[in-house]
Regions:
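Positively charged, solvent-exposed patches that mediate nucleic-acid binding
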Residues: 1-118
């Protein structure tokens, strides 16, 4: 699992499929450049100032990184870019609920792509 760090990668993902849950907004796009690297998916994390100050934004991103590390190796599809956008509930939702939100968003996005999660 690689990280998205460049702005154009985030903008491309924003033009893809978007699924909103109480704690997470998931943006997914297929990336043809990753086809040459089998088994690779990329993930990025964002938290805007609507979440709160720097401490709250950093905490939200840490929670998103932990959720992605737990879920994406099992449910993510290679060849896709995933961007997890923090919402206000990211900070207060129990971690199990955060994981459930991510799994449901992934399943919905993959169904929309025509590549359901196994």
């Amino acid at each position: 699992m690689e990280r998205l760090k460049k702005r154009p990668d985030f903008l491309r993902a924003a033009k893809g499929i978007r699924r909103v849950t109480p704690a997470i907004t998931l943006e997914v796009c297929e990336t043809p450049a990753l086809a040459a690297k089998p088994g690779v998916l990329r993930v990025g994390f964002t938290a805007s100032r609507k979440i709160g100050g720097a401490v709250q934004r950093n905490r939200a991103k840490r929670r998103l990184r932990a959720a992605a590390a737990a879920v994406l190796p099992l449910s993510g599809l290679p060849g896709n870019d995933y961007v997890l956008v923090a919402r206000r509930d990211t900070l207060t939702r129990p971690f199990g609920g955060l994981l459930d939100d991510l799994v449901s968003a992934l399943n919905a996005a993959h169904a929309r792509l025509g590549r359901p999660t196994a």
